[in-house]
Amino acid sequence: MAEVSFNPFDPEFRKNPYPVYDKLRELDPVHLTPLGFVVLTRYDDVVNTLRNNDFSRDIELNANLPETPTRKFRRENERSKSMLNLDPPDHTRLRRLVSKSFTPSAIEKLRPRIQQLVDDSLANAKKTGSLELVEELAFPVPFQVISDLLAMPTDRGEELREWSQIITATLEPTTGVEDLEKGQIAIGKMRPYLEEVIRHRRKNMGDDMLSSLISVEEQGEKLNNEELMSFVILLYIAGHETTVNLIGNSMHALLTHPDQLAVMRETGCTPNMVDELLRFNGPVQHTIRTPLIDTSIRVDNQDIKISKGSLVLASLGAGNHDPSVFTNPHELDFSRRNSNKHLAFAAGVHYCLGASLAKLETEIAVGTLVKTFANIEVASEPEWRDRLTIRGVSRYELNVS
C-alpha cells in the first residue's frame, strides 16, 4: 500500500483536513496509523461501520488499549456512562425514553424564541459594525436555547457555561489527565446544582424538557436519577457545542464562497442549505468505534483485516467529501440534490438526537445574519479549535454593515 500519513495534530491539518482525507481515500482508505488505530475515509466504509452492531461505541469496555494514566483516570472516576458511549440494548432503552422530548413538532415550536435570541445577539453589531461571531452569536444562542428547554434558572448561567466548556474538552480521545481532572472538578460543581434544580422540578413540574424527562415512561420504565443527571449534563454539552461550531463553520464557508452567499441572500437560508453546509464542513469530523469480532474491509482485491478490540476512527468529514457520492465535493453548492446524505450527525443508532435542533438554530442564526447585513467581511482570519474530533472556529471577527 502506498505511503501516506495521517497526523491530526499538524496545524495545517487543523486549518484544512480535506486534502489529507483525499490522499488517504485514494491511496490507503483503510489506513493503519503509527499510533495503532485505523482511519476509514470512504463514505460506504464509514456508513457500514456506524450501522453495524458488531462495532461498539463503548471503547473503555471493549477496546484492547494499553493501560495509560488517562485511561486509568477515566475508569476510576466515571460515575456512569453517557448515552453517547452505550451500545444496544442499554442505549436503545435510554434513547427510546429521551427521544420523546425531541419530536419535530416540539423543536419547531422553538422557532420564535430562537429568532428572538438571534435578533438580540445581533443588536450590538448593528450599532458597532463589528461582530465576534463565536462570542456574540454562535455560542450564546444555542446555550440559552438549552437553558430555556430545561427551564434552568438564569442566576448561574456564567458558571454553567464555564463548567460545560471544561467538561466538553474531556470528550476528546486525546485528552490528558490534567484536563480530565479539571473536568471532574467541573462535574463536581455542576452536579449539586443540577440535583437541586431537579429536586425543585419534581415538586413543581412544568411544560419544559426537564419535566418531560422526569415524567417520561414507556413499558413501565423511567429514567433513574443517575441516568437523568447524566443526560442533562450531556444535553448541556452536546446541546450547544455542535451548533456553536456549525454556525462558525457555515459563515466561514459562505464568506469563502461569495457566489453561494449571494444565493442565500436571494432565497433565504433553507434546510437544504444547512444540509450542504453540514456536508461541506461539519462540526464533528470523526467518531470512534471498536469491533467486537475480527473483521475486514475490501480494498481493491484485498481484504484489509481489522482485529477485534482495535480502534477504528470513522471519518465523517472524509465521507462527506467522497467524490463517489458527492460530485465536486470540495465545492459548496446549494443546488446539490443529495446534500442530505451527509454524515455530519453520524448514522445508525447513534445518529445525533439533537440534529433537528442544531439545524433549526443554524438556519435561523446564519439566515438572519446574512439578511440583516448587506456587507459581511472578515476582519481577521478565524482561529481554529485545537481538537481532533470537533472542527470549528474559536474566534472569528467580522465587519458588518
At which residue positions do the language-model features occur?
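Cytochrome P450
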Residues: 1-401
